[in-house]
């Protein structure tokens, strides 16, 4: 017979997990329910006790026989009904009723000490009648002075608790009287000598005296630290503590002096390497005294430098949040001055200590301040970042700043100051890593054959050579020499972040005020852009120009960027840039003719890239049209702009020799010159002449006159019509800067209009002209004779 099969199914693992979860939940609920019930009971008991105390304190005793009169309410009535139902009065004896009445009249349970809100059975020790104790003590009069007692710990006996006391030792009354008299005298002296109010002059003298003392103290601490930094590193803490100066008369000035002093000290005593924290193994090992002293100096320097930076950060935060300290030593207006000094110190440390600890923390503090509402602070931070970019040879510090700026611009959704992106123009990036072929990257290692080894070096020599190479490599690492590969890698990463920022703005914020800075940056670094992006970038630039939303300066930057791309690696691309030539030709007459002639410099750069460097791709007709329009433009701009434009015209006439037909007034061609047409290829510039040069020859600026005469002569390199070397050897952009009137100076200086004539002093009625002087003297010396005047003969002759 077969064994009976168990019909119960084995529970699955999921079901087991489910049940195991339910049990703890039920336990937790039960536990919480118990806690709640105990709390409810405790609160109910406390409520009853408090009510009993109130009833005991009240004047009218509340009889407990009539509970209905005590508290009217449905709840009390229900309780009374329940009690009556539970114990009917018919079933009780008369003696029991009398006993209950007596107990109700006494209410002895209310005489307990119920001031503390504790349960009734909370303490084992029973409370005694406190009132009876005080009543049993006999009353005494105040004639005899009571002795002061000191209460000690009580002793517990069979009978109960026995309190222990001790008399307080009595001091001599004479001494007390003397002390009291001395105190009274001191109080009288203080009252008699009130604080005199100082006048303004006395207050200023007192402040000057305090300030001089603080200055001397700061100078003494700073000189001690500079003389021996390792021994006096603890004095840095003392000097830094003066940043919390509490004297309201000199607090602001002293804090500013301490900030600047500490900044200069850190610049002087900081080592030229980064200090790393010691490991546990290094701390446990025994070292020499010199090494231990150096370690203590480094630890102290890093900690004080860290606290100093935190103090500067807190000052800037307090000013930004308009916070006042509780002490109110520094006013809210003075916080701005303190914040400016703190920011200036941070900028100095950013530039001076790019290799030291916490440099990234300084960058994080400085970058948001570049976009500050205060123009002075924003310019200060931007100038510091530019200075850092210019002097950073390796590129490590520049990369850190670029990362923070890129993230900040993206986080603010491109609503930042354009000056932040203009700092990118100061980056020292000239080379980047170019993607190599896989064959070049994975070149097999070439080993020397036996014959090559025997011919070149012996075994011992090769061994020595390897040792020398290893030693040189270690020396390079120790001296932190600049590695070309590392430099290229850092520059490539930096430029990638810059281009990502630029392309984001071109894509998402085309109407942003950042666009001119982006286009200017693209124009500078266009030769380093990857060839893969050229087509898309040129399409975007042309779209921006055609949209008409750009100013003439922004559109010039677009043209400049496009031709920088095409003049570099873009030579390989088959792109016709005719639309960019047309746009530049059209924009020339839109240049500002007043003091803000910034666009002229961009035009000179564009002409150099578009016409001079691409001479083989430029037709003669296009060159003639540009020369004619440039000469017309030179008539209505400032002198330095005219000099730069005429210098560019001279270069174009040398680059395209056949353009000299514009100097010949008798030459003829087909068609009529159309000066207002915006197409340089079809304006028939060969049928005109450069008459503007004759007007420029009479210009008030002597250099403009020389250039005009030189171009009329055909721009010769030698002979009487040639220019001086200081003019011919300089580029158009250099001449534009050299003869600028931005500093309100005239180059060359203007000659005096009234020259002084030396050696001749006029005396009396003498004249400069000697003949006139002799004639006057002769007629004045002759004797005057009267002769009749007859004009009729002259009239007769004239009538005939």
From Swiss-Prot:
Keywords: Coiled coil, Isopeptide bond, Nucleus, Phosphoprotein, Ubl conjugation. Residues 40-51 have a biased composition (Basic residues). Residues 451-490 form a coiled coil. There is a cross-link at residue 333 (Glycyl lysine isopeptide (Lys-Gly) (interchain with G-Cter in SUMO2)). Residues 66-78, 160-174 have a biased composition (Basic and acidic residues). Its main location: nucleus. It holds the Pfam family NOC3p. One of its GO terms (cellular component) is nucleolus. Signal peptide: none annotated. The modification Phosphoserine is found at residue 787. It is found in: Nucleus, Nucleolus; Nucleus speckle. It comes from the Eukaryota. Residues 1-93, 160-187 are annotated as: Disordered. Residues 79-93, 175-187 have a biased composition (Acidic residues). The keyword Oxidoreductase does not apply. One of its GO terms (molecular function) is chromatin binding. One of its GO terms (biological process) is DNA replication initiation. Belongs to the CBF/MAK21 family. May be required for adipogenesis. This is Nucleolar complex protein 3 homolog. The gene is NOC3L.
């Amino acid at each position: 017979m077969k064994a009976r099969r168990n019909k119960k199914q084995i529970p699955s693992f999921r079901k087991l997990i489910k049940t195991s979860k339910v049990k703890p939940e039920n336990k937790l609920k039960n536990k919480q329910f118990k806690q709640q019930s105990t709390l409810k009971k405790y609160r109910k008991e406390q409520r009853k006790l408090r009510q009993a105390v109130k009833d005991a304190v009240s004047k009218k005793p509340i009889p407990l026989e009539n509970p209905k009169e005590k508290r009217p309410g449905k709840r009390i009535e229900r309780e009374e009904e329940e009690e009556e139902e539970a114990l009917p009065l018919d079933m009780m004896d008369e003696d029991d009723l009398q006993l209950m009445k007596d107990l109700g009249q006494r209410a002895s349970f209310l005489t307990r000490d119920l001031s503390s809100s504790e349960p009734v059975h909370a303490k084992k020790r029973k409370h005694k009648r406190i009132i009876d104790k005080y009543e049993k003590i006999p009353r005494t009069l105040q004639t005899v002075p009571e002795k002061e007692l000191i209460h000690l710990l009580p002793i517990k006996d069979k009978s109960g608790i026995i309190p222990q006391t001790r008399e307080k030792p009595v001091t001599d009354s004479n001494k007390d009287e003397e002390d009291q008299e001395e105190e009274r005298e001191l109080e009288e002296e203080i009252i008699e000598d009130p604080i005199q109010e100082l006048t303004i002059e006395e207050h200023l003298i007192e402040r000057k005296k305090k300030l001089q003392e603080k200055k001397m103290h700061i100078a003494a601490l700073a000189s001690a630290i500079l003389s021996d930094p390792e021994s006096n590193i603890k004095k840095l803490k003392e000097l830094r503590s003066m940043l919390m100066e509490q004297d309201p008369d000199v607090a602001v000035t002293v804090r500013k002096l301490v900030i600047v002093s500490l900044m200069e000290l850190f610049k002087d005593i900081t080592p030229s390497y980064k200090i790393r924290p010691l490991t546990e193994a290094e701390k446990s090992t025994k070292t020499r005294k010199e090494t231990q002293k150096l370690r203590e100096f480094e630890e102290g320097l890093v900690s004080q430098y860290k606290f100093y930076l935190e103090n500067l950060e807190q000052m800037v935060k307090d000013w930004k949040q308009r916070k006042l300290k509780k002490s109110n030593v520094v006013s809210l207006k003075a916080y701005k001055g303190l914040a400016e000094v703190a920011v200036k110190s941070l900028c100095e440390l950013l530039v001076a200590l790019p290799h030291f600890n916490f440099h990234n923390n300084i960058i994080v503090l400085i970058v948001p301040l570049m976009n500050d509402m205060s123009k002075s602070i924003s310019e200060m931070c931007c100038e510091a970042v530019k200075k850092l970019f210019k002097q950073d040879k390796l590129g490590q510090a520049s990369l850190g700043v670029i990362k923070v700026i890129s993230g900040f611009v993206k986080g603010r959704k491109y609503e930042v100051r354009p000056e932040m992106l203009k700092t990118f123009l100061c980056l020292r990036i000239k080379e980047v890593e170019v993607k190599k072929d896989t064959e070049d990257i994975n070149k097999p290692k070439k080993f020397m054959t036996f014959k090559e080894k025997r011919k070149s070096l012996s075994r011992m020599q090769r061994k020595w050579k390897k040792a020398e190479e290893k030693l040189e490599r270690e020396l390079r690492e120790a001296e932190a020499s600049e590695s070309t590969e590392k430099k290229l890698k850092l520059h490539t990463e930096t430029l990638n972040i810059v281009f990502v920022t630029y392309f984001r703005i071109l894509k998402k914020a085309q109407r942003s005020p950042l666009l001119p800075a982006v286009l200017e940056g693209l124009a500078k670094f266009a030769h380093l852009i990857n060839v893969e992006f050229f087509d898309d970038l040129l399409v975007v630039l042309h779209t921006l120009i055609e949209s008409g939303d750009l100013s003439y300066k922004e559109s010039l930057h677009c043209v400049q960027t496009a031709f920088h791309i095409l003049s570099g690696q873009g030579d390989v691309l088959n792109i016709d840039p005719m639309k960019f030539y047309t746009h530049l030709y059209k924009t020339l007459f839109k240049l500002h003719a007043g003091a803000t002639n910034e666009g002229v410099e961009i035009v000179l750069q564009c002409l150099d890239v578009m016409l001079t460097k691409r001479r083989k791709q430029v037709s003669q007709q296009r060159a003639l049209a540009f020369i004619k329009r440039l000469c017309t433009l030179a008539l209505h701009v400032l002198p330095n702009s005219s000099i730069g434009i005429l210098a560019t015209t001279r270069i174009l006439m040398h680059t395209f020799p056949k353009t000299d037909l514009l100097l010949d007034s008798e030459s003829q061609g087909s068609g009529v010159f159309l000066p207002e047409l915006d197409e340089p290829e079809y304006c028939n510039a060969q049928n005109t002449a450069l008459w503007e040069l004759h007007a420029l020859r009479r210009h008030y600026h002597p250099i403009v006159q020389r250039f005009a005469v030189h171009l009329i002569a055909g721009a010769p390199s030698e002979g009487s019509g040639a220019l001086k070397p200081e003019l011919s050897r300089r580029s158009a952009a250099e001449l534009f800067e050299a003869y600028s009137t931005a500093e309100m100076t005239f180059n060359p200086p203007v000659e005096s209009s009234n020259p002084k004539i030396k050696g001749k002093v006029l005396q009396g009625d003498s004249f400069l002209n000697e003949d006139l002087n002799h004639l006057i003297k002769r007629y004045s010396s002759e004797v005057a004779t009267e002769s009749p005047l007859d004009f009729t003969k002259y009239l007769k002759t004239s009538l005939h």
